[in-house]
Amino acid sequence: MEMQMSNSDRYRIEHDSMGDLRVPIDALWGAQTQRAIENFPISGRSMPQGFIHALGFIKAAAAKVNAELGLLPKSMAKEIEAAALDVAAGRYDAEFPVDIYQTGSGTSSNMNANEVIATLAMRATKGPIHPNDHVNLGQSSNDVVPTAIRISATLAVQGRLLPALKHLRKMINKRARGLGSVVKTGRTHLMDAMPLTFAQEFGAWSAQIVSAEARLNDTLKRLHRLPLGGTAIGTGINTDPHFGRNAVKVLSALTGIHFESANNKFEGLAAQDDLVELSGQFNTLAVALMKIANDLRWMNAGPLAGLGEIELPALQPGSSIMPGKVNPVIPEAVVMVASQVIGHHTAVTVAGQSGNFQLNVTLPLIAYNLLESATLLGNVVMLLADKVIVGLKVRQDRVQEVLERNPILVTALNPIIGYEKAAVIAKRAYKEHRPVLEVACEESNLNPVELARLLDPAALTEGGIHVVGGGGG
């Protein structure tokens, strides 16, 4: 990277293997980054900050290990490492403008990091530091970028998403304990069904979150295997045989996460199956969150003409024309986030099969979609917990009114009077808009006290077979 000043105050002239190029005077990047900026004016969206920070960690680890192996002067390595750690800390995020739709290997972003770090290190040493020969020593974009994706995705999941899910689970469980004795009408096919408690309903949501946490933790084990050291195609050409394993140890120390050197680096470059798997876990979580959000929307619907079982916290006016209207805005946001994450997974799935021969060539797309999914999910899960679950109120009068008039309670009489007789009672109760207990007293030979016991909604939430003269069994 050779630099000379142009006559313009706004630009300097940088040189790379393809010739001279004008670069903004204050930019820390060099010619290869500038070429990428000019080649890919596509979306206006640059690579995620977490990915850039991971590149910083990798360059810092590489400089340290190359110095220990005697491949890089210690003084130079020290300045490269310091500059790289500044990148990892997010101090130079604005210096990474390359579009996500770029070369499929992510080479432009890797060179962006190499050039910025070289410039910063040169400022400290006052001597020449080359982005390829020194900062990128022993590396290739083909092993650096897949490694950066795995590091940044792991940090995003462990640092934000998993803690958010744990918080949501705790809030759901807390509300379930507080509402444990409140019985409500269950629904299947959106139609009235047998009763259950709010604790049982919320418990199902909590179980979904527990399963999501377990799936994510299991997938992360495979993301911890880093292909750094495989260089161009997995053979490790132009790098010390000890570089990859030693650099991964340094990365573990820098991030606080136990990473391992991948046993098969060919797989780590050519196949991104573990990243597709992680995206699949995001997809599954999105489905779970959409189910929970839609349940909340249905339960909150009304307040007069819908189910109206719960009242969600009022966060903002819901209509520009209908005064007093308040909408379930957070559950709606959850649904939209879930929809976007499901779309991201489709993109990652298609991108994952683009590993022709020795290299996947859609790595920036995988990185962007994975990290955005993790960010969206982590943020919206916290909102769901703190702005919905914590503050929702149960409208017990409404819940009790509907419960008492639910003809499906007659299901408990099936073992005693038979399905057909029970159906007669249910249909009559529906038709006459009367409590099922009243109709059952008229249509059966059972006494009112026994019927009241058999049709007690709270007892029915415990399951079992309810018989005359006894409890559930």
Curated annotation (Swiss-Prot):
The record marks E332 as: Important for catalytic activity. It comes from the Bacteria. Substrate binds at residues 105-107, 130-133, 140-142, 188, 320, 325-327. The active site is at H189 (proton donor/acceptor), S319. Its EC number is 4.2.1.2. Disulfide bonds: none annotated. Keywords: Cytoplasm, Lyase, Tricarboxylic acid cycle. Pathway: Carbohydrate metabolism; tricarboxylic acid cycle; (S)-malate from fumarate: step 1/1. GO terms for cellular component: cytoplasm. It holds the Pfam family Lyase_1. It catalyses: (S)-malate = fumarate + H2O. It is found in: Cytoplasm. NCBIfam families: PRK12273.1 (NF008909). This is Fumarate hydratase class II. It comes from Xylella fastidiosa (strain Temecula1 / ATCC 700964). The gene is fumC.
